[in-house]
Amino acid sequence: MISFNLKLYNNNMNLDFSDDQKFLQDEAKKFFDKEGGLSNARKVMDNSLEGDKDLWKKIIELGWTGIRVPEAYEGLGLGHLELCVIAEELGRSLAPVPFSSSVYFFTEAIIKFGSEEIKSDLLPKLVSGEAIGTYGIAEDMHPATESNLTVSVTSEKINGIKIAVPD
């Protein structure tokens, strides 16, 4: 028989949000409750819309698209907990906006892996809403080939076909 005597946490560990994080959570909850919540998501789904562009503009104005972007690139420079607070409230309301793909997938990848040139170019555009980011995910079962991956690029947008592109 094996016995373990592990002390995982000390008695002084506080896992609560800070006062600032609680304030952010309350403000986000009020914001998403006011902006329509589930009824707004249903409207977008029922009308086959791409998303709620007005809601996305308001999220941009609040600066939440730059919540994790360093201040040097025009973001708020906050941490992952603040990002999670916003993401949790956004998910609770089923807000039909490209927050997950653009803010915590694409933007995080640029922050972590982008060159200084790419960061300087893209991060301010992601914060301001001038750009929305996502990426095409490579699948083991369906590798990208000329037959299942097409793309065209204009000065305004990228258009194409690819399996598994978030948002």
Residue ranges: model-predicted function:
Residues 2-100, 121, 125:
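Amphipathic, small/basic residue-rich leader segments at the start of a protein or domain
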Residues 16, 68, 105, 136, ...:
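Conserved beta-strand segments that form the floor/walls of ligand-binding pockets within enzyme
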Residues 27, 35, 89-90, 103, ...:
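Fold-independent oxyanion-binding glycine-rich loops
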Residues 51-53, 107, 111, 143-148:
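Short, solvent-exposed polar/charged micro-motifs at secondary-structure junctions
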Residues 75-76, 117-167:
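Glycine-rich, Trp-frequent "lid" loop and neighboring beta-strands that shape
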Residues 95-117:
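N-terminal glycine-rich flavin-associated loop
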